[in-house]
Amino acid sequence: MDDEVREKLIEAGKILKQAVNEAAEKIAPGVKILEVAEFVENRIIELGAKPAFPANISINSDAAHFTPKKNDERTFKEGDVVKLDVGAHIDGYIADMAVTVDLGDNTELVKAAKEALEAAMEVVRAGVSVSEIGKAIEDAITNYGFKPIVNLTGHGLLPYLNHAPPSIYNYATEKGVTLEEGMVVAIEPFATNGVGKVGERGECEIYSLLNPRPVRMKMAREILKEVEENYKTLPFAKRWLKKAPDIIISKLAREGVLRAYPVLTEVSGGLVSQWEHTLIVEDGGATITTK
């Protein structure tokens, strides 16, 4: 990894850490979810980076991919378990970070995912198998009496690609990819008091450009032009676009031009906690860009 790339990764992480920590302090009962999402996204820009994807603010049994709609009036409530998962990039070099804010009495659930992340980061180094990382995560979560979510993973990060190989499972697998020096990875344990699996629910506000190709409708062409120019292959929120009629966005997703990211929720309705950091893999350890 050359010095310029490393500097951009570390700067993106530094900016993201500040923005996320400031945003987390604003999460409280009665506050609009949209207010926090817009704050953290705008703060990233103010500090000199760009959002790598829309702020995910998934609450209670929702684990991932919830972002508010334009003019969304929904608010945080007493008792909520709030996951704030945000990304920032500089010239496509991405940092990814998540924290959980507990507005109720779920201290142990929150600690389970946080300690799982700490345990996982302790074993990250060039030459380690992702199965060893998964075991560290699983052991930490099950020690608290909770379950890891088995179908959500940590992941690699590449320029303008926020989910790349390798997948880093939150449990011990029989085989696994070996981490290499210079890899950039996001480790994100999810803990739950449910059965440990997520499924899709209907709501979807996040999309990315999957297969750019000519389309007939004028407004569809305008949407794709805006997406290509501003977000490239990174995910975007419908509320970020000048115009985003549901019927056109849905049609582009059905046709495979856009990829949809529906909200993922714990299938048994269990509460979910999450913590995440981004790491540059090195010989003998790693640099955590978001800590």
UniProtKB/Swiss-Prot annotation:
PANTHER family found in the cross-reference section: METHIONINE AMINOPEPTIDASE 2
Cofactor binding note: Binds 2 divalent metal cations per subunit. Has a high-affinity and a low affinity metal-binding site. The true nature of the physiological cofactor is under debate. The enzyme is active with cobalt, zinc, manganese or divalent iron ions. Most likely, methionine aminopeptidases function as mononuclear Fe(2+)-metalloproteases under physiological conditions, and the catalytically relevant metal-binding site has been assigned to the histidine-containing high-affinity site.
The protein, known as: Methionine aminopeptidase
Cofactor: Co(2+); Zn(2+); Mn(2+); Fe(2+)
UniProt binding sites for a divalent metal cation 1: D85, D96, E276
Record-linked InterPro entries: Creatinase/aminopeptidase-like, Met_Aminopeptidase_Type2, MetAP_archaeal, Pept_M24, Pept_M24_MAP, Pept_M24A_MAP2, Pept_M24A_MAP2_BS, WH-like_DNA-bd_sf
Record's catalysed reaction(s): Release of N-terminal amino acids, preferentially methionine, from peptides and arylamides
A GO CC annotation given for this chain: cytoplasm
Family: Belongs to the peptidase M24A family. Methionine aminopeptidase archaeal type 2 subfamily.
Keyword Transferase in record: no
